[in-house]
């Protein structure tokens, strides 16, 4: 870790374990719907996904009775804000946002005002400054507002692992160093 950020091998390990955890949740037929940094507890054995308070099983309605969307700005997928049902792909967008937060040390869509955070997420305007080129490109893809253009969690992890081979890239934010 560097300056509170997860970089290189540390980010790759965090990402791999978090992705494994979310895959297990999805294999059980559950969509978490609220993956954010405060719901990822880091233990000696890796991250633990917590707070399944708004999680839903397959076939359940994913919108509240009043039609309100549940989630945390900056960590809720853009399509959910537009009224789409939560699903595995929206959880994966949230995982990418959490990992980008871990890599940069701050929420990549900002913190306020809330509407501005939602607008930046909807536009795919993540602040990924300082990340190596390959990792940055993979995060841009994983956080794309158009879900059909997003890379898979495994592709994101592969880009992080590749950049982890060059520790200097995480210092300079440029894999060509």
What are these regions (language model features)?
Residues 1-176:
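Eukaryotic protein kinase
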């Amino acid at each position: 870790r560097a300056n509170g950020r997860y970089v290189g091998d540390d980010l790759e390990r965090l990402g791999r374990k978090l992705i494994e955890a979310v895959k297990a949740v999805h294999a059980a037929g559950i969509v978490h719907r609220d993956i954010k940094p405060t719901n990822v507890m880091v233990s000696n054995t890796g991250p633990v996904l917590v707070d399944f308070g708004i999680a839903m099983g397959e076939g359940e309605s994913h919108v509240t009775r009043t039609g309100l969307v549940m989630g945390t700005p900056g960590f809720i997928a853009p399509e959910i804000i537009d009224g789409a049902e939560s699903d595995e792909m929206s959880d994966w967008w949230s995982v990418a946002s959490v990992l980008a937060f871990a890599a940069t040390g701050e929420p990549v869509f900002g913190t306020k005002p809330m509407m501005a955070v939602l607008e930046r997420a909807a536009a795919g305007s993540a602040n990924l400054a300082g990340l190596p080129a390959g990792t940055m490109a993979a995060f841009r893809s994983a956080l794309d507002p158009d879900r059909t253009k997003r890379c898979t969690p495994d592709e994101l992890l592969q880009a992080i692992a590749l950049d982890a081979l060059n520790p200097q890239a995480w210092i300079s934010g440029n894999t060509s160093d």
